[in-house]
Amino acid sequence: MTHMTSSNTARSAEWFEKAQKLTPGGVNSPVRAFGSVGGQARFIEKAHGSTLIDVDGNEYVDLVCSWGPMLMGHAHPAVVEAVQKAVVDGLSFGAPTIGEVELAQDIVKRTSVEEVRLVNSGTEATMSAVRLARGYTQRSKILKFEGCYHGHVDALLASAGSGVATFALPDSPGITGAQTSDTIVVPYNDIEAVRNAFAEYPGEIACIIAEAAGGNMGTVAPKDNFNDKLLAIAHADGALLILDEVMTGFRTSYRGWFGVDKVAADLVTFGKVVSGGLPAAAFGGKAEIMNMLAPQGPVYQAGTLSGNPVAVAAGRASLKLADESLYTTINANADRLHGLISDALTHEGVAHHIQRASNMLSIRFAEGEGHNFSDMKAADIFRFAPFFHTLLDNGVYAPPSVFETWFVSSALTDDDFSKIEQALKPAARAAAEAKAS
């Protein structure tokens, strides 16, 4: 596939060539390689507020926000100050700190969870939550949803086979059938498929795990009280509900997705915002369940860098800034971006629907809202790559995949929106002119 490229990406190209000799694919997380859109990945040198600056000096309005955590934009002075103070006092202790207790208090105050365990990544959080659910229920099977991503945990990297509910086939080489043999996958937003799975395996399912709102098949919100119904079905069979709020937690509202639908899941995972953009995450839930964890209980979970004081400082500073007024601004910015994208695509006659889950959004290049992964794949996906690259070449950094969510920060300015509006005009034309290969 051929794409227009910026006139100045020489250093990004040079560093990407070096990286490919040292790192698989030249990146440390696959989506960064621009694999689904083609073209030259940009190497970012620094960022301030709403602006990314690459190694060639090109500036971009940031609509990725490091995949969610940058609520206030990049390098917010209060977060930077908190990190600087923490660094001076030591990088890691391998011992309890006051800060980690205070961060746990912040999480408990804003959500439904009663106790919290800090970990190092969203993957660790979901892996640990599933282990805990299995230990608590003394059951093995788990139920997840097609298109919901929960990190690169072996049992959760699975895609659905044929039928309403089926044992999943592994979705990556290196994951054996045995590792996913207890994983059941059903379509998202399909409550009957969930009921059928529990009817087929009564008393065998340890937990349902779902993104609180889908953000990895594009943006797909739960419909018709879906999460509440999941909780009821799980509890009726003695199973638990895990809601994955790694993406939505403290991003979609002051209380995360819990603030949107008020569903108090048995276990909840957090990441991204909770660490202020540094490598940390958490999971929490009802005290009765959490107390099954070592050293209090028999379910083992540990981490040398868990509760890292620098990451904790960044997370606490970010949550302190994330008051209700901040979400008013972020929601307004998401609405404004939504309108600009839709207006530009409508002007060019491009069939589309802007998918929303609070202030998270994505584009479905087809008429009507998508409610599951099949819906999101049944669109003119070929239109996204030229749309993306035209935005990029006009100074707007959007997610480099049609199946990723767009994020806004409170740092966006009127000038940023003017730049976005101007970039969307040629981008929408490029989408309109795109042809399926």
Curated annotation (Swiss-Prot):
- CDD domains, A to Z: OAT_like
Task: Report the main location listed first in the record.
Answer: cytoplasm
Q: In which pathway does it act?
A: Porphyrin-containing compound metabolism; protoporphyrin-IX biosynthesis; 5-aminolevulinate from L-glutamyl-tRNA(Glu): step 2/2
From the UniProt annotation, give the residues forming the signal peptide.
Answer: none
Q: Which cofactor does it need?
A: pyridoxal 5'-phosphate
Q: Which Gene3D superfamilies match?
A: Aspartate Aminotransferase, domain 1, Type I PLP-dependent aspartate aminotransferase-like (Major domain)
**Which EC numbers does the record give?**
5.4.3.8
GO CC field: cytoplasm
Keywords, alphabetical: Cytoplasm, Isomerase, Porphyrin biosynthesis, Pyridoxal phosphate
Provide the family line.
Answer: Belongs to the class-III pyridoxal-phosphate-dependent aminotransferase family. HemL subfamily.
* Entries under PANTHER family matching the protein: GLUTAMATE-1-SEMIALDEHYDE 2,1-AMINOMUTASE (PTHR43713), GLUTAMATE-1-SEMIALDEHYDE 2,1-AMINOMUTASE 1, CHLOROPLASTIC-RELATED (PTHR43713:SF3)
Provide the protein name: Glutamate-1-semialdehyde 2,1-aminomutase
Q: Which organism is it from?
A: Corynebacterium glutamicum (strain ATCC 13032 / DSM 20300 / JCM 1318 / BCRC 11384 / CCUG 27702 / LMG 3730 / NBRC 12168 / NCIMB 10025 / NRRL B-2784 / 534)
Give the classification, highest ranks: Bacteria, Bacillati, Actinomycetota, Actinomycetes, Mycobacteriales
